[in-house]
Swiss-Prot record:
GO terms for biological process: nucleosome assembly. InterPro entries: NAP-like_sf, NAP_family. It is found in: Nucleus, Nucleolus. This is Testis-specific Y-encoded-like protein 1. Ubiquitinated by the CRL2(APPBP2) complex, which recognizes the Arg-Xaa-Xaa-Gly sequence at the C-terminus, leading to its degradation. Belongs to the nucleosome assembly protein (NAP) family. There is a cross-link at K156 (Glycyl lysine isopeptide (Lys-Gly) (interchain with G-Cter in SUMO2)). One of its GO terms (cellular component) is nucleolus. Its main location: nucleus. Residues 41-82 are annotated as: Disordered. It comes from Pongo abelii.
Amino acid sequence: MSGLDGVKRTPPLQTHSIIISDQVPSDQGAHQYLRLRAQSEATQVMAEPGEGGSETVALPFPPPSEEGGVPQDPAGRGGTPQFRVVGGRGHVAIKAGQEEGQPPAEGLAAASVVMAADHSLKKGVQGGEKALEICGAERSASELTAGAEAEAEEVKTGKCATISAAVAERESAEVMVKEGLAEKEVVEEQMEVEEQPPEGEEIEVAEEDRLEEEAREEEGPWPLHEALRMDPLEAIQLELDTVNAQADRAFQQLEHKFGRMRRHYLERRNYIIQNIPGFWMTAFRNHPQLSAMIRGQDAEMLRYITNLEVKELRHPRTGCKFKFFFRRNPYFRNKLIVKEYEVRSSGRVVSLSTPIIWRRGHEPQSFIRRNQDLICSFFTWFSDHSLPESDKIAEIIKEDLWPNPLQYYLLREGVRRARRRPLREPVEIPRPFGFQSG
């Protein structure tokens, strides 16, 4: 039998009690009668009438006797026993011993029947409690199962909603992409329609192309072939200019790098040369090109030179600077004379020098005559900036004497020693002192 919650339940125990009351004629029977009555009242179980219920059927006890004892039956055979009948239907009442009395032995037998029935009823009640506990456990398990199924259904519903949302987003994105492609195709079609000229314009364009072709044919093949030859030549020249520019930049970087490395050694060399009397005068007089310009008074003035420095300007290709240091002498008052060559942006070379403050009566002769040629004197080189010979002196000093003056100083005694590099003649340059060292 199943209830409303779907759990199978055990039908209640159906009991029908039949209580038989007899009169107990003796004291022993009265005592048993009272005990049985108390037990029957304590163990009566009321149930709903009809099918599946437990019913108690009891006969009313006969009234007590006039003597104040236990009620007696008319025959005086004993008390009325009470007992329960299990499994009956409806209300049943069985009277026994109302008209005919029963012997006391039958009263004892009835009491035994009641006790047995009472024991069976207790077992039935305990079984019913156990059945109720089992039913409660089954109901709790069914409730937990139902709750888990509801939660799983909710999770499944949430997942379905998420998947549905993702599918909807993907479909909307695909729709947007399709719309964009459709718009792009429409725009391209419009552009193609706009680019297509009218029929009249197409005719004009074709006519212009035909006229241009006729003009090229009339000019002949020579200009075309010349253009074909000039284009590769111009391309090669552009590439060559690019390589030259890269070489210039690399050369400048190398000059800066090694210039810093040389500076340390040049400072040490200058310090040693300052302590050698007449070092630079001897080097100048032993140089094959410079010795021709040192005559008479120039040789005397060079005896007072203490040091010489050649420095390039900020950019190596923009020029250089010559510094001559002198000690006190009777010819001029300057202790430092500077000769500077600067290459301007136009490419023209400009020379500048410190004015020499001559002492009275010691102005040098500007030119000397040798083999019918006018030769610039050494000290005239400081102040005269017009003759090409002046630029030649600067080139010799910068490129030959300054890098290695020791080799010319050692020629004083005519001793040929091993040189780090051989003597070289100064190279003629196409323009005045361009300092084309690279």
